């Protein structure tokens, strides 16, 4: 890349930094005064004219300054050399806050609240997908001699409880045998394999336990093949009102705050945006029209997966106006996702 291209990118970077910070269109004079670009005002004006002609910046109708376009933000994000990592104390504070969660629901709620506070944007976390989980443990509890409570615990920390009505009374010794049979078929297996294993268990079980096994297996298969991952925790929507001007259609940004709020109410829209994240090692940035959601054309979505040992439990991310602190937000999303995965995998 030529020195001219590098210089023009520095001008673009400075425009992005100033506009994100001030929300005011940026002029060449301000750039020269605020940034050590090492060139004259005339050169900066020429570079800005080039950036505008190429579609990286645009001129709002009401100002002589320029603002970044979606294309400009994309160029900026793609050329971020280093995302400033969080400090040791910041990382410890995040981990300690999440570790204080009493269960899966609490950990995810804490994660959303924390991410919304760190980024001052809308934060969203997807509940762990059962299809990507493994069975850590199955507990079988006798509520009465003819009624059982099955407690299924996955490696992502998800807990599902189901009631089984038995045809006959089950003695304590038989309960232990049933617990061993079901646990042996399920524990350590991915849920898809576990559902097959437990469905086949009836043919292999002792005759005196067959009815209890069939009834338990029926309930477990229903649990294992459900898809409760279509659940989200959302937080920080009040942050949208702080940035309401960004959704007013000014500066060439289409859409409105109302349209964004309506889109957030449709979980399928948010799940689609999180679906762009396929692993827990990469942060995905979708800017403006890249979201492919009409109501979200004035927004950016920064997301990644959370999980452990190479398994993605679900997605986590933030949504806000395209005018956002991309380096800081990327770092926050990555850190919170990492520690949510660590906390859940240790439970």
Curated annotation (Swiss-Prot):
Which superkingdom, per the lineage? Bacteria
Q: Report the Pfam families cross-referenced here.
A: HrcA
Gene3D superfamilies (alphabetical): 3.30.450.40, Heat-inducible transcription repressor hrca homolog, domain 3, Winged helix-like DNA-binding domain superfamily/Winged helix DNA-binding domain
What keywords is this UniProt entry annotated with?
Repressor, Stress response, Transcription, Transcription regulation
Give an example GO biological process: negative regulation of DNA-templated transcription
Q: Which SUPFAM superfamilies match?
A: GAF domain-like, Winged helix' DNA-binding domain
Which molecular function term from Gene Ontology is one that the record holds?
Answer: DNA binding
User: Any idea what job this protein has?
Assistant: Negative regulator of class I heat shock genes (grpE-dnaK-dnaJ and groELS operons). Prevents heat-shock induction of these operons.
Q: Which family does it belong to?
A: Belongs to the HrcA family.
**HAMAP family under this entry?**
HrcA
Name of the protein: Heat-inducible transcription repressor HrcA
The organism encoding this protein is Rhodococcus erythropolis (strain PR4 / NBRC 100887)
